[in-house]
Amino acid sequence: MPVITLPDGSQRVFANPVSTMDVAADIGPGLAKACIAGRVNGELKDACDLIHEDASLSIITARDEEGLEILRHSCAHLLGHAIKQLWPQTKMAIGPVIDNGFYYDVDLEHKLTADDIAALEKRMLELAKTDYDVVKRVVSWQEARDTFEGRGESYKMAILDENIAKDATPALYHHEEYTDMCRGPHVPNMRFCHHFKLMSVAGAYWRGDSNNKMLQRIYGTAWGDKKALNTHLARLEEAAKRDHRKIGKQLDLYHMQEEAPGMVFWHNDGWSIFRELETFIRHKLSEYDYQEVKGPFMMDRVLWERSGHWDKYADAMFTTASENREYAIKPMNCPGHVQIFNQGLKSYRDLPLRMAEFGCCHRNEPSGSLHGLMRVRGFTQDDAHIFCTEEQVQEEVSACIRMVYDTYSTFGFENIVVKLSTRPEKRIGDDDMWDRAESALIEALNANGIAFEILPGEGAFYGPKIEFTLHDCLDRAWQCGTVQLDYALPGRLGATYVAEDNARQTPVMIHRAILGSLERFIGILIEEYAGRFPAWLAPVQAVVMNITDKQADYVEELVKFFKEQGIRASQDLRNEKIGFKIREHTLRRVPYLLVVGDQEMENREIAVRTRDGKDLGKMSIDAFVASVKEQISHRSLKLLEE
């Protein structure tokens, strides 16, 4: 007689083993209709799985995050059902859940086109709308293998042979004539899988190994209702409009080319943004009492072996040789900073020592993973390393947290998710050291009033870590900032200081990044602002346009004066109609459009418009300059009179 305890503490007693669906039906028909799965004693189970003993139970519906993941996974199986009907020779590989959707890797000689994807989606919807039941069967390893061997599913056979023990009992999910294998759970009926869309198809190697066959990966998105699906599709449409690669080309910010894959060619206006970011971060470094250093791009392999990076990152490092010595271009700055720390005897009085660098790093990322500014091979990190005593860790981490939030708020990012990764199973040091380290990070977060999620076991072997993930205007997550404790690298590279008792001690090292990669952060900003940078960041802050040739000298005089006042200004003296000029510079997202005619020239004024079309009227030159300079100095996100 299992006693089932529900989330509200109420209990229901059953005479025989009972499923989650049975419990839902016992509560009411509405809940039974909405039931997708159950969380039994904390573990997700199919709605049909029997509960034999007393248990706690949460009933999962499409409104729950777990329910959404389950229906997405079932949509991947639905894709398999449909593609096998349209192209029976297809061999199915893997079909996992991803953010907002799913994909399925398939082996099909026919190269799928956009029309094929549309036909596949149509067949999926036709099948789903029959609201057929999904039937689960738990079988022996041999029966599962025989099932897939009989269907010619070589990839499923490989998964069984290589990844599943022979004494295991795999679960097979039957979608009418189609059968798939999965840990589950899955929806009990396809009525839950009506709101999806296939998005794209791309190439993907089996098991991610370029030595294996290239498969076709079909991506889809799925949601619990039509409104949520349409909201997501609208968000994707807006994201496409904001694509930094498209806007970067429109605004002539940068380009990339085949001869330097993953490397950025910064054009004048893009480099202006880059330098402005550097200037801003330098102000922060000064405010928080950092030194700025510069290390070499390339160092001997011996150093990378001592640091431990050669063992872990060799495949991602660009290397070269000279005079019988092997060198690696740095993928990160930390070993170089330890070398600077090691120059000269350090005392406890010198700590904390905060060392920052705009370090130019290179990593040999796979060519298929490169994506505009978001995933590159050459990048600049706003990297810093703090050498301190263990007693100073909490205070230093707390300052890092304040610096992160100060910085992000300047750009308008207020929705920041913080995660603390704690000790992994394989780690250096004893439990006391990890207790102190984790407590220091937790206390620093609490002291700053920061809500955070703990990720047990996700820390590095050498110390716990805080990650800062910002959410943009489209609610996309971008992991940028990190604060990582390191109890290993200083010792590996011989860093010591003289403690108060004159003994040599190894400092704790705090790795700290705020923007992360400047290139990537600029990509994020382009998409966040849709190219409409706040005035302080905009490559051109004001453009002055004449109506006739009579005002040309006055325009040139104004531009010269603006530049002297620290305003990035340009002029447009072309023999074009003023409306044409205004439209063109509006499309280039210039914050202020200044028009000069005879009257403005006579009165030593300018007619001021914003790129949003707001007419600010006529202003004196001094009033405009004073207002814009104040706006720039405060790094305001808004234009005048917004």
Curated annotation (Swiss-Prot):
Q: Where is this region: Catalytic?
A: 243-534
Lineage: superkingdom: Bacteria
**What top-tier enzyme class does this entry carry?**
ligase
A GO cellular component entry from the record: cytosol
GO BP term, pick one: threonyl-tRNA aminoacylation
Question: Matching PROSITE patterns, A to Z?
Answer: AA_TRNA_LIGASE_II, TGS
For this protein, what does the record note about how its cofactor is bound?
A: Binds 1 zinc ion per subunit.
Return the EC number: 6.1.1.3
Assembly? Homodimer.
Annotated family: Belongs to the class-II aminoacyl-tRNA synthetase family.
Protein's name in the database: Threonine--tRNA ligase
Look up and give the organism this protein is from: Shewanella amazonensis (strain ATCC BAA-1098 / SB2B)
Supply the gene name: thrS
